[in-house]
Regions:
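C-terminal regulatory/interaction module of P-loop NTP-utilizing enzymes
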Residues: 1-189
Length: 189
């Protein structure tokens, strides 16, 4: 048989590894997909032998490329279903409805105290990814100011994504202070 002529290796999919890879600028995965995978980790890989399409890190990255071009909202389901399967498409397009109701990111970056902090975990995952994507040297103090109002889990998520995306931002004084605070809490907890 043909399969005896090939090497077979089973790989395990890890959400943290995927997200660390996805936030890097050179991989350019859209924040909506990163947030979604964090919120629904079971959707990163869901192989069903009978399915034509199913989610994997590769198909999710391919979907990101398609969506990055800007597609009409009524086409998102069809693209997601064709690339990652029906179940993924249902969950993802539902998530997008939440994502699109996020607080105004530009307002957070300029006046973080004027924006209410959401309480829904789905929204917080989406918000952390969106903020990390927009963080730069000019707005980092405001990003951290807003981050301090988030729960610890989302503070850590935000700092991790920022530092993976741009290590230089990890040298910001506000970033360092919050990071030290989180490390102190973790070591005492």
């Amino acid at each position: 048989p043909l399969r005896s002529r090939m090497w077979h290796c089973e790989l395990k999919v890890d959400v943290d590894d995927f997200c660390a890879w996805a936030v890097k600028p050179e991989n350019d995965i859209i924040p909506e997909l990163i947030s979604f995978v964090r919120w629904k980790p079971d959707q990163l890989h869901d192989f069903e032998p009978d399915m034509t399409a199913y989610p994997t890190p590769r198909t999710i990255a391919m979907l990101s490329k398609l969506l990055k071009g800007g597609v009409p909202a009524d086409m998102e389901f069809a693209l997601a279903e064709g690339m990652c399967g029906r179940g993924f498409a249902i969950e993802y397009t539902g998530f997008l409805k939440v994502y699109r109701t996020l607080p105004n990111i530009k307002k957070i970056l300029t006046d973080p105290d004027s924006v209410d902090v959401p309480t829904d975990p789905c929204t917080l995952y989406a918000l952390a990814s969106a903020l990390a994507r927009q963080a730069d040297a000019g707005n980092m103090d405001n990003v951290i100011k807003f981050a301090k109002r988030l729960g610890r889990e989302f503070q850590l998520l935000l700092l991790t994504d920022i530092s993976v995306r741009d290590k230089k931002l990890g040298q910001n004084k506000s970033f360092i202070a919050l990071n030290c605070e989180l490390q102190t809490i973790a070591s005492n907890g």
